[in-house]
């Protein structure tokens, strides 16, 4: 699906910019010179949320209350409505969306809001085999204060498929990206891991990529068939805090995680 795969970048005061997939992995960290770091603090706060195409009331108040203090906001099913774009450009230096498919008015897909400009951006898409609709993912890279580069993967996994072949296929190019990156990684989003086979495929992928799963003490994540759908995986970082915000502003509850960029725990 590379032909129709691209990201749209929204920056305050500038026209939206279309970004095509990079030609090679060699461009990771070389596409742009590192600018301001993602965080000047000793912590990185992220919010991960399937925002349900902003179909419910209060989604904006949730973002304003919990997203504005985050260095990264990873949204799934984000529609580029004027309200969302205005919030993103007013509170973040960059907002990158990968349109999975175009709805009557606004494209919908994963969207990453960041407190720093990414030095690398790779949009990805995979088509649902049954509904023929696409799901998207986005790989971005940001400089950290310690000169390392943080890779961030925002993913909305395919939902309706027989078996796990297409599910695993969507993870393959993400694995290629991680394999060519030596720094810390955060991979998060709606993984639609509602079956045992999907969970096993996801956990196997995480192990192969040396990614650890963020654990939530009061685990109020959205579930299907008793299994959580939303996850945060990481490497090269420490988890300081992790919580789930219970809200009716979407059919998913946002995940709030704070990382410290020091050396990870053994």
Curated annotation (Swiss-Prot):
Classification via Pfam families: Exo_endo_phos
> InterPro entries from the xrefs?
Endo/exonu/phosph_ase_sf, Endo/exonuclease/phosphatase, UPF0294
Transmembrane domains' residue ranges: none
One GO location term (cellular component): cytoplasm
Could you cite one Gene Ontology molecular function of this protein? catalytic activity
Sequence similarity: Belongs to the UPF0294 family.
Q: What is this protein called?
A: UPF0294 protein YafD
Q: Which organism is it from?
A: Shigella dysenteriae serotype 1 (strain Sd197)
* Gene transcribed to yield this protein: yafD
